Amino acid sequence: MFYLDSRHVYRVTELDSIEWLEHGFGTRLSDIPARFPRLATLKQVHSAACVAAEGRAGALGTGDALLENTPGAVVAVKTADCIPILLVDQRTRAVAAVHAGWRGTVARIALAAVEAMRDRFGSAPADLHAAIGPGIGKCCYEVGPEVAQRFGEWGRAHIDLAEANRLQLSAAGVTAGRIHASNLCTMCRPEEFHSFRRDREAAGRLYAFAGIR
């Protein structure tokens, strides 16, 4: 279950019991870079590329998922309608932050991130928690036929990006009870979230972060 904390960050109740974990999904009112000055990010390119942060901070090149298992390190992705996903392996103390827009979803970035966690850290998909944060909802995400057809059976006039990524995570082996979805639409809630579709070039960015204390 998602809830808003005193720092205006959405957290996941089921992840709060993991004592070494830093995690959250920022809002318009939260300043994540100020809180974590050694934050690692990527130039996001709507791909299925996964990058290992290895304790580094700052901008670490191009890609759409950042992996980390270094104590004291925090990784993040930036969104403004795209779906942010956090992966957490309590057993191996490893995390990933994933950026899934429609192109990344079609490229199966969620699946690629689960496989990268397995290959780099030995994470079993069934051990992972996956938190799907605020993004544009099916209610607001109307697309043209050229986009809809890329989603196969999910290719309707309104695309449910969060559900498409939930299905990818499930197909990758993440168990249903460990997939936590916010069901919060960024376009519907201007008081809380930035939205590129709503605000265009004036839109800011929301940070979704995960790290190891």
Annotated model-derived regions:
Residues 1-213:
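Active-site microenvironment for binding and transforming phosphate-containing groups
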